[in-house]
Amino acid sequence: MPLPADPSPTLSAYAHPERLVTADWLSAHMGAPGLAIVESDEDVLLYDVGHIPGAVKIDWHTDLNDPRVRDYINGEQFAELMDRKGIARDDTVVIYGDKSNWWAAYALWVFTLFGHADVRLLNGGRDLWLAERRETTLDVPTKTCTGYPVVQRNDAPIRAFRDDVLAILGAQPLIDVRSPEEYTGKRTHMPDYPEEGALRAGHIPTAVHIPWGKAADESGRFRSREELERLYDFINPDDQTVVYCRIGERSSHTWFVLTHLLGKADVRNYDGSWTEWGNAVRVPIVAGEEPGVVPVV
């Protein structure tokens, strides 16, 4: 049975406030039946140096991705993962992580691929929890098998592929959420990260550049509904929007903002992103600060 939504007035203006919880709400419901807490970080070692009591760790790389094919795990593997982590199909899952929930949003997006009904983010994530000196532990909870059912992934509503992107160029909004250096073609990866994963640099023609981190404030919380509406004011209600980054993790954060905080009806994450596009043969690429135009073939 899903837990009640967080009634905090700080969340009420969002289109789907039930997709967020505050630290106060999580503290008050900690240990409640039907609540599963998940930590998913970019830095996969953080869980081991202290985490929210009762939280289990999901490693974005080893737990959610197929070990050989570039794809996500299948229904059988997801059910096994949920069993191992003690998560039931009808649990309320609250996910949090480092860096303004960057990777936590990615985990939430994967949960959504499998149709888990009630999955939420902790607003502010791990960093805000620690900044407020809330309780942490080194204890790893012992979980029992939940009998999570095998549910096949449903990619179509929220996942885009390369051909989908080619089909909408110039006709529907395309948002590049990477760093300015990546967008302009100066780098193939973020500053302070190794240059790897793509043979070409730049961005997809017509893509508007809005770095994912602009949706969060200095505390790691999401910006207000009003601020977010201004940031994405070019998106119309009937648009079919696609977001992308390098491997789909930063764009998952933007997907969450557009879908759950602003209520946009048709938003898909192109998780192939630049490590596919920047290696593909004969796809159009633009360098510089302007979105560019669709080339005439």
UniProtKB/Swiss-Prot annotation:
The keyword Repeat applies. It catalyses: thiosulfate + hydrogen cyanide = thiocyanate + sulfite + 2 H(+). SUPFAM superfamilies: Rhodanese/Cell cycle control phosphatase. The active site is at C245 (cysteine persulfide intermediate). Pfam families: Rhodanese. The modification N-acetylproline is found at P2. It is an enzyme of class 2 (transferase). GO terms for cellular component: cytosol; peptidoglycan-based cell wall; plasma membrane. The keyword Electron transport does not apply. Keywords: Acetylation, Repeat, Transferase. Residues 31-138, 168-286 form the Rhodanese domain. SMART domains: RHOD. It comes from the Bacteria. One of its GO terms (molecular function) is thiosulfate-cyanide sulfurtransferase activity. Its EC number is 2.8.1.1. Substrate binds at R250. Contains two rhodanese domains with different primary structures but with near identical secondary structure conformations suggesting a common evolutionary origin. Only the C-terminal rhodanese domain contains the catalytic cysteine residue. Was identified as a high-confidence drug target. This is Putative thiosulfate sulfurtransferase SseA.
